[in-house]
Amino acid sequence: MSNKFVITWDNMQTYCRQLAEKQMPAEQWKGIWAVSRGGLVPGAILARELGIRHVDTICISSYDHDHQRDMTVVKAPEGDGEGFLIVEDLVDSGDTARKLREMYPKAKLIAVCAKPSGADLLDEYIVDIAQDTWIEQPWDTSLSYVEPVNRKSK
């Protein structure tokens, strides 16, 4: 992907607050299920903004930084998702979103960003991103990309 879209911490906070506004009234939600790992930070921000204390994770592995690979469900809450917000940072190809819809047909699926291939699978999102654009999330960057600690000195 030749194009890059960098999201700062300030941008992420703003986008998540906008997404939270669309989820009001907060009392309608039993909790938030954040999709690990990209949905963890947005999920935490939404939990704060909505005053939700019940936060859990859905652990689906399909990326290794910038390489998509086979999808593996590592951890999944039980139930059909009724009353829960499922939070992602980004819906790209839509593969993960399709899997989430299959697993939790009654949940509300939301994301901060969406690319055209997956946008229709979401109930709501904030930022449109071109399909050929790579997103650098604030937790992946400083002034430039920083390798995670566990990848140094290997």
From Swiss-Prot:
User: What does the entry list as the binding residues for Mg(2+)?
Assistant: 89
GO BP of this protein: GMP salvage; IMP salvage; purine ribonucleoside salvage; XMP salvage
Residues the record lists as binding xanthine: 92, 135
Q: Which GO terms describe its cellular component?
A: cytosol; plasma membrane
Per the record, the major location class is membrane
What is this protein's function? Answer: Purine salvage pathway enzyme that catalyzes the transfer of the ribosyl-5-phosphate group from 5-phospho-alpha-D-ribose 1-diphosphate (PRPP) to the N9 position of the 6-oxopurines guanine and xanthine to form the corresponding ribonucleotides GMP (guanosine 5'-monophosphate) and XMP (xanthosine 5'-monophosphate), with the release of PPi. To a lesser extent, also acts on hypoxanthine.
Question: What's the name of the protein?
Answer: Xanthine-guanine phosphoribosyltransferase
What is this protein's gene name?
gpt
